[in-house]
Amino acid sequence: MSEKIVLIDGHSILNRAFFGVPPLTNSEGLHTNAVYGFLNIMFKILDEEKPDYLTVAFDRSEPTFRHQMFDAYKGTRKPMAQELREQVPVMKEVLQAMGITIVEKPGYEADDLLGTIAGMAEAQGMDVSIISGDRDLLQLATDKVKIRIPKTKRTGTEIEDYYAADVVERYQVTPKEFIDVKALMGDSSDNIPGVPGIGEKTATNLIVAYKSIENAYAHLEEITPKRAKTNLEEHYDMAQMSKTLATIEVHAPIEFDMEAAKLTDLYTPEAYVYMKRLEFKNMLTRFSDDMSQNDLEKYFHVYHELDEIQNFFDGFSAKEAAVSFFEDAGTVYGLAVAESNQNVAYLTCGGFVTEGYLEEQAQKLCDGLDTLVTPDLKGLLKHVRVTETKNCIDTTIAAYLLNPLKNEYTYDDLAKDILGQMVPSQVDLLGKLKIKKAADEKPEALELLACYQAYTCIAAKDQLLEQLEEHGMKKLYDEIEMPLVFVLADMEKEGVRAEKAELENYGAQLTGRIAELETSIYEKAGETFNINSPKQLGVILFEKLQMPNGKKTKTGYSTAADVLERLAPDYPIVSEILEYRQLTKLKSTYADGLALCIAPDGRIHSTFNQTITATGRISSTEPNLQNIPIRMELGRLIRKVFVPKDGYVFIDADYSQIELRVLAHMSGDQNLIAAYQHAEDIHRITASQVFHTPLEDVTDLQRRNAKAVNFGIVYGISSFGLSQDLSITRKEAEGYIASYFETYPGIKTFLDRLVTDAKEKGYAETMFGRRRPVPELSSSNFMQRSFGERIAMNSPIQGTAADIIKIAMIRVKQRLDREQLKSKLILQVHDELLIEAAADEEEYVKTLLAEEMRHAADLAVTLEVDVQSGKNWFEAH
């Protein structure tokens, strides 16, 4: 049986994959879809072919001998998209990591190298498969050389195969004659001119009849139609040059070592690292199970028995260590301690080794440390007390600041990104098992997982801090993010009291109103139907009731919120449907959902996250209290459910227009600054200027529209977006925005500068140095680029506002503690803070809260704070 070689046209397959696979990026912001598609095609080919040799050829950027012959060769091609260009070196690195031979040569195209190597291999009796999306390579097909043309589709990769006989069957000419057909008809993609006036049909007929261009010219007098004869007669030189341009050079002067192209194990440790970095998780399954085995494990020590665990604690004397409780869903499975990257211990919880015992010993250990390192300081604070003055390093928060675009910050990513090491991930160790089940079924794997996590923390800490320093974010980390951990930990511990009876009453109100809406909707529709079914709703609205602008998709008419909102002003039934949707969501999420979140102490203990959003805003989960609706009355009423404990009141403080005030400060626009300094109604002032109306004559509608413009500008709103928000024409929206920038010219200059700076630096930056990468700005896609520009404009403003809120939280909490007040900060929602205050401290705490929030940042305009109090959150807001 003959040996086989597979030859891949690198740029061609990469290009085909780029346009065939939807856009993908990894958590670093690197575009990966072309590499992903290329590898899928390559693996499919290798699985089918099982070759003995493999080589990938790439084009070079220098001109080739064809350019020297014809300056305009390939001159009509658009420049390579930046998203694809950045993937070419990555693709080469991945191939090299797999041990795959890459060939390229100045002055020659990949086609020439493939043709040359194919000839060598065929001469040695090998079977050859050439993989390319370029049909020019069909001229290389023989009985031993097969051309394979992949087509990337959503359903997978389909491949067309061509031996010499297949080319004849499909194109009526032999592979060698295929060159002449292309030379006569020309090729717009390569800008090969061909013979003017001769298309594919005429060219094919001529070559079928005469076998070559040379023979066609030898029988020129016989050629019909007359126009073809005349064109050939007048463009002889063009025909000859086009044939030379179209002919693949099969004797390129390259030194090719066939033995070096021998296919060995592609699934190397180096390739594994690349797959993890690119986040091609499904490709990791191709690697052997022992790929995750690591020499580091010789430094891991696991202790199960009480006496050996006690001996560990008794002998521990390090002043620096990584410490973390390994737990899941409230159950502690053990304690991981790494005093260096060569001494990692895991102390299991069970039997005589109780959670309380581990907490007691961990407390003593932490008290003796000068530097405490952990992947989750907030989680650790549930088990041990740590003073805010201790030198603490939270590796997750540090990693988040360095790259806030990631979805999660796992220890294996930290090892890869910071240490350049490959360590097994949780999936590698546990598969799909949850922690609880793994504790029973794979205890040793769970122990390794805890050790790897502790190892990565202690090993990465110095580099993390160095990178924060290099990126100018060490102060942000030290003075905002780390102190905030203690604030959030206390807030989670305190929780907020929820009144079950009030929650049931609220649910009953919603149920009653939902029933009223159902009845009214059915009456207006003339029949009952499933309001929650988009398909049934679409039929009612756009077929039965004949509403305009129905957009039909494969599954029926679109009944998305934006579609219904445009219809609502003219159709009462649509307004009711929108309200019905809002109320049913309120009932399921809050009336029903919150009841499940009330702990035995009668309070809801939400989890606050500081490593989730790209802008630096805090988010909350289980439950998400950030999304409590405020625009509709029934939505606001949910706040009545939240009440203070006996003898206490709620004090609520809300920043007034913080993002606009930040915009005024950062832009330095004198008109906006002056309006705030004179405590004027900023929306009314804007309306007066934008709509050229005397201040006293500004209507409520004009003020609302001006408010939409003010806040829309902060979010980089487009004329289209504003027109949708205000239900006006795009031209009117353009006029509003233009008038706005005439009123506040400094803002226009500032926003333009933000975009320019972000393009140059690759990131947007807040007043406090927080960075937000904006890879979308380098996209060749207009929509993506526009999105990136909006991010570049918004992130510095929204991020600065988020930083100010965090500073305010720290100041408030530290002052409450310093003055030993009974009142506690218990909740943060966007620009709003909620304190559960002792009744006898109410007035003092209101003053304290306002003072600390106002002085959280030194801006060119005052940070105004609205402070209210009440016997529930609704009253206090």
What do these predicted ranges mean?
Residues 2, 24-25, 75-254:
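Extended two-metal-dependent nuclease catalytic cores across DNA- and RNA-processing enzymes
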Residues 5-6, 10, 16-55, 71-72, ...:
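Conserved RNase H-like, two-metal-ion catalytic cores of nucleic-acid enzymes
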Residues 154-158, 164-182, 335-469, 480, ...:
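Active-site-proximal helix-loop-helix substrate-binding element of RNase H-like nuclease domains
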Residues 337-341, 402-432, 449-456, 610-694:
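Function-dense linear segments that define catalytic or interfacial modules
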Residues 468-480, 484, 804, 808-829, ...:
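Active-site palm subdomain of RNA-directed nucleic acid polymerases
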Residues 493, 601, 605, 610-613, ...:
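Conserved catalytic core of nucleic-acid polymerases
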Residues 512-519, 523-575, 742-790, 794, ...:
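C-terminal polymerase-core module
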